[in-house]
Amino acid sequence: MAVLRTMKLKERLVISLGATLVLLTLLLIVDVQMDFGVANRHLLQQQHQKIRLGNDYDGGTGGGGMLHEFKRKFLQKSNASGSKEASTQAGASQSGGATSGQDAAAGASGGAAGPGTSRSTSTRKPTPHDRYADLQKHLLSDEYSHVIVDNAPDVSRDNPTLAEMLHRKASANASNLERFQLRITKKELYGEQDTLVDAVLRDMIKLPIQHVVQKEGGTQLKLIIEYPNDIKALMKPMRFPREQQTLPNHFYFTDYERHNAEIAAFHLDRILGFRRAMPVAGRTLNITTEIYQLAEENLLKTFFVSPSLNLCFHGKCSYYCDTSHAICGNPDMLEGSFAAFLPNFESGNRKLWRHPWRRSYHKRKKAQWETDANYCALVRDIPPYDDGRRLYDLMDMAVFDFLTGNMDRHHYETFKVYGNETFPLHLDHGRGFGRPFHDELSILAPVLQCCLIRKSTLVKLLDFHNGPKPLSQLMSESLSQDPVSPVLWQPHLEALDRRTGIILQSIRDCIKRNPPGDVDGSETDVSS
């Protein structure tokens, strides 16, 4: 105290200011570590953009809408915990899309709710089926071509096969898989009427297994299945019954992989007309004769008999490869998904791309797109998204992942030989179809932030929504051909119809927020 008294006023002020700065720094560190969300609340960058995300006005939907819902749950909580995902709870009817932004965001238009949800009697009239006549009208004109883009790949032109690009011919005793691989083209994995798809599926289901090897790398157990004539498939074994959902306390990056999700994703990709996922089929194996007796030594060491006298194994991997998370037969019969291998010849190598809307894969940190309202403008300026088809392919991928509920899209691959003007492969869907009563709106972030969708994709979604057959029925009919049918739990099928309506409502919101006269490339503050 005596020292303070002898100090000059100026020195006291300097010391006080220094102490205050130290205290503020400590408070900032505590805020970041404890995730209170104060530090970053006003730090959103304001960058240029090419299309307007919009403010709270929603053009007649009461200030709601998908974009507002996404912004409210993400962009205004930039420092929130990663476990607090943007969501819409189930409750939408499978036939009717939401007629307002609030209804779509809540998924509530009179359908089934999730387990434990109480039902109350209402005197309100049921919401009539919204056929999205406005979107159908916009399809007939170019007025909103900045949102609905006519960029469907023309498979009839400039579409060479891998065989033509690599100057390879099928060998004399070529398998169906080898011939399928050589017929892969620049714009799709297989043609709409390609009969080799069913032949490849049939081989994976019927051919005898010769050898089993655990696939190296990855977070969970996968097996490489080898058949005669150098045919290979990637097996994901069954862990849970169809109706078991994602554990509520699991992050997306620690979720279990589901074999049936791989099967369903292939069928959905084909129904959507993308044809960017390799054929996948279900099959039931005898663990003793078709895995244990054919496996290599490293995998054999992990086999054991459970207290229930079921034959089990767990392999070696990053997650869930131990005795408490073993794969078990019943007692030695095991179901799994079998995905056909992509080409492995040298010139057919693939390029790995980091997905621009990749998640942080961290318990607390958020990715840039989760905090920057103008993030799409940055992506649009970076090759290969600044030109060509790639950005539109990512919109398709977002639609596909939103329908399946897959949050685990961190990278994607393309064939090197075709350069940048080719399609991204749809691979690794094991974390889809886990939450039928929850619609993860953040998966749709590319579409919501860019306000962009392919015309051909929108046409498909409208066809599913308006009939004659909804997407759930088309999926059910397609999946019924698989040996392990029923592949999906009924609530997952119903979720497909509900999510179709949510996507359509999102495009409607985008159109209202981006009238033709507003597309001028000017900067707009969308974070307010």
Curated annotation (Swiss-Prot):
Protein name: Extracellular serine/threonine protein CG31145
CDD domains from the UniProt entry: FAM20_C
Regions that span the bilayer: 13-33
Location of region: Disordered: 77-130
Lumenal domain ranges by topology: 34-528
Biased composition (Low complexity): 86-107
Reactions listed under catalytic activity: L-seryl-[protein] + ATP = O-phospho-L-seryl-[protein] + ADP + H(+); L-threonyl-[protein] + ATP = O-phospho-L-threonyl-[protein] + ADP + H(+)
Tissue distribution of the protein: In embryos, prominently expressed in midline glia, salivary gland, intestine and dorsal vessel (heart). Not associated with biomineralization.
Species of provenance: Drosophila melanogaster
EC top class named in words: transferase
Annotated site residue numbers, Cleavage: 76-77
Amino acids binding ATP: 220, 236, 257, 339-342, 413, 428
UniProt-annotated glycosylation sites, renumbered to this chain: 79, 173, 286, 420
Assigned EC number: 2.7.11.1
Binding site for Mn(2+): 257, 428
Function: Golgi serine/threonine protein kinase that phosphorylates secretory pathway proteins within Ser-x-Glu/pSer motifs.
Residue spans, topological domain Cytoplasmic: 1-12
PANTHER family: DENTIN MATRIX PROTEIN 4 PROTEIN FAM20, EXTRACELLULAR SERINE_THREONINE PROTEIN CG31145
Record keywords, A-Z: ATP-binding, Disulfide bond, Glycoprotein, Golgi apparatus, Kinase, Manganese, Membrane, Metal-binding, Nucleotide-binding, Secreted, Serine/threonine-protein kinase, Signal-anchor, Transferase, Transmembrane, Transmembrane helix
Main location: Golgi
Cystine connections: 312-328, 317-321, 376-450, 451-510
